[in-house]
Amino acid sequence: MNYILGTILESKITGVEKAQINRLKLFKQHGISSKCVYVKWNPYSYTYAKQHQIENDVFTMYDYFQKAINYKKTKQVNWIQYWEKSCRYTLKFVENSNDVRIYDEEQFVMYAHFLDKQYHQLNYVNYFDHKRRKVKRELYDGRGFLSCSRILGEGQRIVLENYYTPNGEIVIQKYFDDIKGKNTLTKVILNEDQQQQFFDTEDELVQYFLHQLCKNNDQIILDRPHELGNVIAGLNQSIPVVVVLHSTHLSGTGNGIKSFYKTVFNNLTRYKAIVVSTEQQCQDISQYIENKIPVINIPVGYVANLKYQFDINQKEKNHIISIARLVENKQIKHQIEVIKQLVT
């Protein structure tokens, strides 16, 4: 199995996630076993994967431990009826929203947010004490089950997180503490097969997950070395890892390798190979690392013989279209400066 490893799949994807999805589909077309695996908790990973028609080939580390990889919604809970009929609560619907205030007699106890106007898809429920202080939040998976609850302390600081299976069993607990004004993870407890595993950091949990996941010569294809390079560096050498560099490897300041690729070049022997996008980069890196490991050039996707749907001779003059995410490293400011110079 090829595990295409990333951090998170969200509603709006970057070029890295787009490359992962394209690779997954290409592998599937050629009968190569593969899955996209993400390490961050995201209760809507299944929903977003479904938008790309890959929902059966995507899961997260949390899906793995929560026993929810193949989970499909089986029934729809009527929350409004449950609160009104079974719990005898009083509901007040918040105007111009999908939100509901919930009262136990006269006391305000819960605030629920739904993703739809029909109040079918529950997103979260906040719980309040008798002083109207928020003390707990429950977050629901897009498939309908309670995925995570957060116990809140002073100033709504997270004290404890519980992660659940679709059957309601707690499988992961995370404890937090205020360290120098920053809410910091101090302990992770994993309940697995009637045993408990203890971790001090999220990276330790991810490392344990990858050791459990990869069996029988399974291979990892790493697309996020900056975020996961330290995890991979401590991974058992028996697990082959291919790393993909989605950008140039040299710093623009002339200080050598870019900081977010240093974990790769500082741990070269940990990797089976490096994949880059151009032949020139392939040659440069091979020379730089003195051919210690293979460097492979796989060009990025492109469209040949594109048929224009418009008459290019009739296009409007003095207009430029720029397609990029609105982030600093896309050099949007440089593009704006170019336009300013053209029009002044």
Where does each model-flagged region fall?
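N-terminal subdomain of nucleotide-sugar transferases
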Residues: M1-R88, V125, S147-S149, G155-E161
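Short N-terminal targeting/anchoring amphipathic segment
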Residues: Q197-D203, Q207-E227
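Membrane-proximal helix-turn-helix segments that form the acceptor-binding/catalytic region
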Residues: Q207-K215, T248-I274
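Active-site proximal beta-strand in glycosyltransferases
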Residues: I221-R224, A233-G252
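Acidic anion/phosphate-binding donor-loop and adjacent secondary structure
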Residues: G252-G256, G301-K317
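A short, active-site helix/loop in glycosyltransferases that binds the activated sugar's phosphate group
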Residues: K262-V295
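Conserved donor-binding/catalytic core segment of Leloir-type glycosyltransferases
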Residues: D311-K330, I339
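A conserved nucleotide-sugar
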Residues: I332, I336-T344
